């Protein structure tokens, strides 16, 4: 089947037994001036930034009172670090014990991806307001349940896409584009050209590192043997726990790209092409990938490149000057967003015509401050990155990955034939092929994976006519770590 003719498209365009739950009658709302007690759950990586941000909000009445991690060494190190600062925090290994503490008001979640939605839903059900790292979900369905939970229990849930705090550096550029000052949008490109080397390859199951509660680490995911050298971080590249770089670094740029388009639904059609190329290791997710979201307004095209600009190089490619960023191509020029806090507009000749920088600093600190202000006001509309925004951007990553996982290997000639009806897709694929050739990847012997075009009903967030794709919108949860359906 032909992948599409874009012109033609535009013409037609309650919880199970054993599940942890705290009844909402067991909590009460604090007064606006009260101290807000906070906990960070999972801090072997991004959680360190959560600790710093919350600790910096003392003047806003926020107090870090607890830390939670399933790794005893990480937990002890975190508690000791706070102790040296004169801050006494209560250590927890199990998030369920955290949520039983009625004195905790804010739960900040930076666990591996497979825990994000469940931990946040449990926290909301326990009466807590939540800051949850991106992606807010491991799959589409559980992300929607988190949105439903936030609304049902009237809790404030902020997504950790801190670029949304850049109101002058990026937000004003969004307004500039949406007001039509550069003409019609042709395409929005997200790029994640970030070095990702091999994670190595083991020939036997690895021992569980000492001090880790592995049952809790796995949580809702299968409790499988460890088949990689490093338990921590490299879970990003294993489907049961992570979502590849599309759902790791890429979710930030996917979110900015959707922000520019102003889309508040999932795309009606999506497809993917790519693979894990350039080395053989224990990773499962693509290190080279294109995801094409076929919105009626303009396509959102996302690229992941983990290999360098060429074999042996230490540099990465760039697209219109963007390595990890966003490029908005319009009839009258283009805008680049090369960072979390700035944007630049160019005319058709490439001359810079306008530049935006963040006047309030941007990033983590103002994003957390905005979260706390919304906790005080009880208005989720005041959030920079309300959970609905986080769900939609996360789900765009998930649907792209679903196409990849349902794909089949194909020769480059076949791929080019399938997409020849679309100039943007063809140009993007051609650039990816040249990139792989520069890395001496022999595409005659190592084939790319071409995913199917998946049609979606954005209202129901289910695919049309593809039962196999629908199955991947959720997962089989491991008891008792079951994500509840929230009506």
Per-range role (PLM):
Residues 1-132, 141-157:
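N-terminal glycine-/serine-/threonine-rich beta1-alpha1-beta2 phosphate-ribose binding loop
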Residues 47, 91, 116, 142, ...:
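Conserved donor sugar-nucleotide recognition element shared by glycan-biosynthetic enzymes
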Residues 71-74, 92, 110-116, 136-138, ...:
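Short, solvent-exposed turn/loop segments enriched in Gly/Ser/Thr/Pro and often Arg
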Residues 74, 86, 110-114, 137-141, ...:
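Alpha-helix capping and helix-loop boundary segments enriched in small/acidic/polar residues
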Residues 37-41, 45, 64-69, 108-110, ...:
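Structural recognition of the beta-strand scaffold that forms the well-ordered cores
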Residues 129, 137-216:
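A contiguous active-site-proximal alpha/beta segment in oxidoreductase catalytic domains
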Residues 10, 51, 55, 79, ...:
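Non-transmembrane alpha-helical segments in soluble domains
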Residues 172, 184, 189-190, 198-244, ...:
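Contiguous beta-strand/loop segments that form the cofactor/metal-binding neighborhood of enzyme cores
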């Amino acid at each position: 089947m032909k992948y599409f003719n874009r012109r033609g498209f535009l013409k037609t365009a309650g919880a199970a037994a054993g599940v942890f739950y705290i009844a909402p009658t067991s909590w009460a709302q604090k007064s606006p001036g009260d101290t807000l007690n906070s906990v960070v759950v999972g801090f072997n990586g991004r959680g360190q930034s959560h600790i710093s941000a919350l600790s910096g909000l003392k003047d806003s009445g926020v107090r870090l009172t607890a830390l939670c991690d399933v790794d005893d060494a990480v937990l002890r190190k975190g508690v000791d670090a706070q102790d040296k600062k004169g801050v006494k925090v209560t250590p927890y290994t199990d998030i369920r014990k955290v949520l039983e503490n009625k004195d905790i008001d804010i739960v900040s979640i930076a666990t591996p991806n497979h825990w994000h939605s469940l931990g946040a839903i449990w926290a909301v059900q326990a009466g807590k307001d939540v800051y949850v790292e991106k992606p807010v979900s491991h799959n589409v369905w559980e992300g929607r349940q988190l949105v439903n939970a936030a609304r049902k229990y009237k809790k404030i849930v902020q997504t950790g896409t801190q670029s949304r705090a850049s109101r002058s550096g990026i937000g004003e550029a969004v307004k500039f584009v949406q007001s039509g000052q550069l003409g019609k949008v042709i395409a929005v490109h997200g790029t994640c050209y970030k070095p990702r080397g091999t994670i190595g390859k083991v020939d036997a199951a690895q021992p569980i590192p000492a001090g880790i509660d592995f049952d809790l680490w796995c949580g809702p995911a299968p409790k499988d043997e460890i088949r990689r050298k490093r338990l921590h971080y490299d879970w990003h590249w294993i489907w049961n726990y992570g979502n590849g770089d599309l759902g790791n670094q890429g979710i930030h740029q996917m979110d900015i790209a959707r922000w520019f388009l102003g889309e508040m639904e999932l795309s009606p059609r999506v497809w993917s092409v790519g693979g894990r190329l350039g080395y053989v290791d224990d990773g499962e997710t693509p290190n080279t990938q294109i995801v094409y979201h076929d919105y009626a307004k303009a396509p959102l095209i996302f690229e992941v490149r983990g290999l360098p600009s060429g074999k042996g190089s230490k540099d990465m490619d760039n697209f219109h000057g963007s390595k990890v960023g966003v490029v908005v191509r319009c009839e009258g020029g283009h805008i680049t967003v090369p960072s979390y806090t700035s944007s630049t507009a160019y005319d058709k000749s490439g001359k810079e015509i306008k530049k935006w920088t963040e006047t309030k600093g941007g990033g983590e600190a103002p994003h957390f401050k905005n979260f706390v202000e919304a906790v005080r006001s009880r208005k989720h509309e005041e959030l920079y990155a309300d959970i609905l925004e986080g769900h939609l951007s996360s789900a765009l990553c998930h649907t792209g990955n679903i196409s990849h996982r349902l794909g089949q290997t194909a020769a480059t000639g076949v791929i080019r034939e399938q997409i020849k009806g679309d100039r943007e897709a063809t140009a993007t694929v051609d650039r990816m092929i040249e990139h792989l050739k520069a890395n001496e990847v022999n595409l005659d012997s190592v084939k790319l994976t071409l995913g199917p075009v998946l049609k979606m009903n954005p209202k129901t967030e289910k695919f049309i006519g593809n039962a196999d794709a629908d199955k991947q919108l959720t997962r089989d949860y491991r008891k008792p770590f079951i994500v509840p359906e929230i009506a």
